Structures are given as structure tokens and as C-alpha cells.
Amino acid sequence: MHHSGPLLKRRGGQNREGIMADNTNDKLPAKDTTVMEPVIDKHYQLIETKRAEEIIERAMNLAREQIPKGKVATYIPELGKMDPHQLGICLYPLKGDKICLGDYDTRFTIQSVSKVIMLIVALEVCGLKAVFRKVGMEPSGEAFDSLVELDVSNSKPYNPLINSGALAVCGLLLPEVSFQDMIRYTRNVCSDMGIELNEAVFDSEMKACSRNRSIAYLLESKGIITTDVEDTLRFYTKMCSMNVTAESLANLGKKLANDGVCNIDGKRYMSSRTARIAKTLMLTCGMYDGSGTFAIKVGIPTKSGVGGGLLSVSDKRAGIGVFGPALDAQGNSIAGCKLLREISNELRLNLFYDPEWDKEDAEETVLKDMQARSVM
């Protein structure tokens, strides 16, 4: 079992401070009272908060136009009851005021965004080698609940941000931590003591989890899951059924952006290495089989969930949380992705920012490049 000093507190274990310590009675980090500090973009040009708000408002209006093209998730009956027209965002810069617009404080279930939290805790409690013995680090190119890679002899899940990989991570975590440990840590890292298990969604998901159950038993047959399969499945489903807000996710994103440290109270919530691994996998694998397109067009490490949530990290700059339950064909928030693309371009948050992308779509740019090469 991996140990990394004062960060850890194992289940039922020592009375030492750690990421799993019971801090539910701690005060939330003090509100950032800085007035009109600038948002800092990739090129360190100063953008006043008021201007950033105007940019995000315009982006929200453009994003809302995409909502009719999406649909809420219906394979989980409770999620099918969500209002597809909701849209909210919270952008929390390391320097400057938190910007919250729309339905940013509406509670929704975290769903697959929780895979980032599972990965963080697994890396801290079990260690890098133990985690990546169970799962890979590669994009899958398949749907989030795909069984394809598991059909290959001696294979393991491609990465921890798809269902099979997250189930494998849960099997690794379950002997060490309980769900109560996990929800406690989630409240702390999201600076949101209002996070609770949504029992109705949990029950609905457990009744509709035939595919995840198949994945879990297949993982057991390969020796990847060694804990009780049904216990592992319940643990995983509970993690997906926690109620959060866009603001909760922005709080988490901000700590990831600052390499695991809250810049207000100075508390470390994960090691810098864990934060780096999480951000890297979010960029390459966080949007399922839409990850490559999203990385090119938006260029911000992001993890999506079928509840409509998006957790985004602009490294060293800001955490972003988005809520928009109308989904595209890949199961990602259709308005949320458009919103992130717009603000990524306008605020220069794209890791690979290219001003030409402001002028024309990626497909046209690539086509022109190919035509230019053929002429030459």
C-alpha cells in the first residue's frame, strides 16, 4: 500500500491529518473579497472582471441556441425528468472575482465527473503504480460504457475516466475507504457542505445498471476487480449520484488549476503530481469519444457527466463548472461545450490557442491546410 506522508488517512486509521480526514465541521474557505481583480489570460493580458462577465454572457446566449439540438439522458429514468433548457456557469479565477451566471447554483447529480474525484483519491491512497496496474492511460475512442477493450484477452480498461476504468478504480478503493469517506472528501475539495447522495437517482441507476453490472463482472473474471462486485457497483453508483452545482465543480477545478492547493486558505487537497495526472487525463480522455475534437476546439482539460455537468481546468488560471443537461450524441452537455468553446477563445484559455480558430471552424481550417499542401 502506497503512503505519501501527511496527505493520507486510511479507513479506520491513524489520527493524522490527510485528504480523507473528517473536516465536515471545518469552516469553508473564506470568500474571496477582492474587488474587480483582473482575470489573467494565457498571454498575461489583463481582462477586467466586468468585461469577462460580458464575454461569458454573450457566450451563454450563443450556447442556448444549441439546446434544442440536445436531449436529456433517459436511460436513467430520474435523469429524464431534468429541464433541458437549464444552463449555468461558474468561473473561479485564481486571481479575481468568481463569475456565476444562469443556473450555476442548481443541484444536479455529478455522474461521471466523479471519476476525477475517484482517481484523485485512488492515487493518493493507493499510489500511482497500483492504480495503473488496474487501468491504462490511453484514450479509448469508444463510448463511455463500451465493453470493446475488455473483450481483448488480458486487456485492462483504457483509462480511469470511462465506466470500466472507474469501476476498476472503485474495486481498488473499496477496501481502503468507505462512501462516507468519499462524500466527506468531495464536500471538502468542492468547498460545498451541501453535497448529499441523491437517493432517488441512486435507486433509479441501480435498477438500470445492467451494462455496468456486465462490465463489473467481466472485470472480476479478468482479476481486475477483486472486491465483491455488487458492493463495488453500489459504491460506484453512489459516487455518480451525489448532488453538486456548477459552483461546486468550479471550486474543485480551481484547486486542480493550482496543483491541488486552495489559494485562499493554503490547504493542500492532493499532491501536485496527482493534480497533474488528473488534468492530463481530463484533456485526453475526459469527453469520451469526443475528447480529441474537444481538445482541438476548446483545449481545456474537462470531464463531463450525463447529468449535464462539466468540470474544466484552465491551468494556473481558473476552475470552471458548467451545468447544461441537454446532451449531444457523445453524452456531453451540448450547450455547455459550446459555452466553453466560446469563452476559451475569447478569454484565451485554450492550451493551444490559435487566433485563426476565432475566424473559422476547425473543419474548414484543416481542409484549407490540406488543399494548400496539395497545391505545393
Residue ranges and their predicted role:
Residues 79-82, 157-159, 207, 299-303, ...:
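Short Gly/Pro-enriched turn/cap motifs at secondary-structure boundaries
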Residues 206, 217-277, 330-333:
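Penicillin-binding protein/beta-lactamase superfamily catalytic region
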Residues 4-19:
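Short, Lys/Arg-enriched N-terminal segments with co-localized hydrophobic residues
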Residues 28-45, 60, 259-291, 295-376:
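Structured C-terminal helix/loop/strand segments within mature extracytoplasmic catalytic/sensor domains
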